[in-house]
Amino acid sequence: MSLVYVNVMIAFLISLLGLLMYRSHLMSSLLCLEGMMLSLFILGTIMILNIHFTLASMIPIILLVFAACEAAIGLSLLVMVSNTYGVDYVQNLNLLQC
């Protein structure tokens, strides 16, 4: 296993650890999720390029599309919670239930 793979996996684990530790604010949770998606994108791209599997070259692009949709929904939820309650605590999301 090369050093690049190890670094990308460490970046993913640090983002996952940040997501588990800093759950109180929605903005920090969204940043950790984006870090996880970025490390998955880099890992998938490097693996596809190393094994020369050109048929799967669209998979990282599809992952980026889903990451962009996740970021847009997360930011709109952040704006809605911030405008409604004035803070971005994750515990306020329980109040959004119908």
Swiss-Prot record:
Q: What's one GO BP annotation on this UniProt entry? A: ATP synthesis coupled electron transport
Main subcellular location: mitochondrion
List the EC numbers from the record: 7.1.1.2
Q: Which Pfam families match?
A: Oxidored_q2
Q: Does the keyword rRNA processing apply?
A: no
**Catalysed reaction, written as an equation:** a ubiquinone + NADH + 5 H(+)(in) = a ubiquinol + NAD(+) + 4 H(+)(out)
| Molecular function as annotated in GO | NADH dehydrogenase (ubiquinone) activity
Membrane topology is: Multi-pass membrane protein
Keywords attached to this Swiss-Prot or TrEMBL record, sorted alphabetically, are: Electron transport, Membrane, Mitochondrion, Mitochondrion inner membrane, NAD, Respiratory chain, Translocase, Transmembrane, Transmembrane helix, Transport, Ubiquinone
State any GO CC term. Answer: mitochondrial inner membrane
Q: Which InterPro entries match?
A: NADH_UbQ_OxRdtase_chain4L/K, NUOK/Mnh_C1-like
TM ranges are: 1-21, 29-49, 61-81
Where in or outside the cell it occurs: the entry states: Mitochondrion inner membrane
**Highest taxon of the source?**
Eukaryota
Q: How does it assemble?
A: Core subunit of respiratory chain NADH dehydrogenase (Complex I) which is composed of 45 different subunits.
Q: Which family does it belong to?
A: Belongs to the complex I subunit 4L family.
- Role description: Core subunit of the mitochondrial membrane respiratory chain NADH dehydrogenase (Complex I) which catalyzes electron transfer from NADH through the respiratory chain, using ubiquinone as an electron acceptor. Part of the enzyme membrane arm which is embedded in the lipid bilayer and involved in proton translocation.
Q: What protein name applies here?
A: NADH-ubiquinone oxidoreductase chain 4L
